[in-house]
Swiss-Prot record:
Phylogenetic placement of the source organism: Eukaryota, Metazoa, Chordata, Craniata, Vertebrata
Pfam family, one: Trypsin
Name used for this protein in its record: Snake venom serine protease homolog 1
SUPFAM superfamilies: Trypsin-like serine proteases
Domain Peptidase S1: 25-251
Signal peptide from the UniProt entry: 1-18
Coiled-coil ranges from the UniProt annotation: none
Assigned keywords, A-Z: Disulfide bond, Glycoprotein, Hemostasis impairing toxin, Secreted, Serine protease homolog, Signal, Toxin
Disulfide linkage: 31-165, 52-68, 100-258, 144-212, 176-191, 202-227
Subcellular compartments: Secreted
Main location: secreted
Reported function: Snake venom serine protease homolog that may act in the hemostasis system of the prey.
């Protein structure tokens, strides 16, 4: 049953890529309730307001951005409408946090990744299912799906009750180098967006997935301010570049090292 559910979710994602996102993530539409069983929401014990998103890899592990780390993190699974609890909705706390560098330092172009082991595994449900790591590297020109509870307006922060989804395109990294001063010649990040502007990830979407051609290829890292401006794509941590590190940590391999 779990395999059937995962395959059905992947089929739904593929169908989503065939649709054009044309409305208000920014510039998107409300996600279908069955489209994002792997999407998780992060908040702290003191605040119920979501500050980041993440992706469920299996019953015990979540992948998100290093910039999403906080004290007393709470992770919610199976959430759609923040004000309406799903019957299979669950909450967990971290047991372990793994960063690509021991100091937890990261930059806007490198090592913005955090792997969380849950204190207690989550249960499979209608609205809870994992998303696999990518089996192939991403291809420039791919249509990618973004999603999250981030702001849906640029000039004034407006957080929706339900996650928004949108389609964007994957560009060569040089496009982001042209858009933002100070980016190094090479980076383990992906550049994605809409050059005309109007569609983009935004505040609180950090840590959420970038899904290209049905594969989990990126983690929301940072975007221009304000969001969704022309010629200002967002940057996403390249998940494929970190798969060996991720799989090693999950397998309890104490010798695994982060990519240089």
């Amino acid at each position: 049953m779990v395999l059937i559910r995962v395959l059905a979710n992947l089929l739904l994602l593929q169908l989503s890529y065939a649709q054009e996102s044309s409305e208000l993530v920014i510039g998107g539409d409300e996600c279908d309730i069955n489209e994002h069983p792997f999407l998780v929401a992060l908040h702290t014990a003191r605040s119920k307001r979501f500050h980041c998103a993440g992706t469920l890899l299996n019953k015990e592990w979540v992948l998100t951005a290093a910039r999403c780390d906080r004290k007393n993190i709470r992770i919610k699974f199976g959430v759609h409408n923040k004000n309406v609890q799903n019957e299979d909705e669950e909450m967990r706390v971290p047991k372990e946090k793994h960063f690509c560098v021991s100091s937890k330092t990261y930059t806007r172009w490198d090592k913005d990744i955090m792997l969380i082991r849950l204190k207690r595994p989550v249960n499979d449900g209608t609205h809870i299912a994992p998303l696999s790591l990518p089996s192939n590297p991403p291809s420039v020109g791919s249509v990618c799906r973004i999603m999250g509870w981030g702001s849906i307006t640029t000039t004034k922060v407006t957080y929706p009750d339900v996650p928004h989804c949108a389609n964007i395109k994957l560009f060569d990294y040089s496009v982001c180098r042209d858009a933002y001063k100070g980016l190094p010649e090479k980076s383990r990040t992906l550049c994605a967006g809409i050059l005309e502007g109007g569609i983009d990830s935004c505040k609180v979407d950090n840590g959420g997935p970038l899904i290209c051609n049905g594969q989990f290829q990126g983690i929301g890292s940072w975007e221009g301010h304000p969001c969704a401006q022309p010629l200002k794509p967002a940057l996403y941590t390249n998940v494929f570049e970190y798969t060996d590190w991720i799989e090693g940590i999950i397998a309890r391999n104490t010798t695994v090292t982060c990519p240089p």
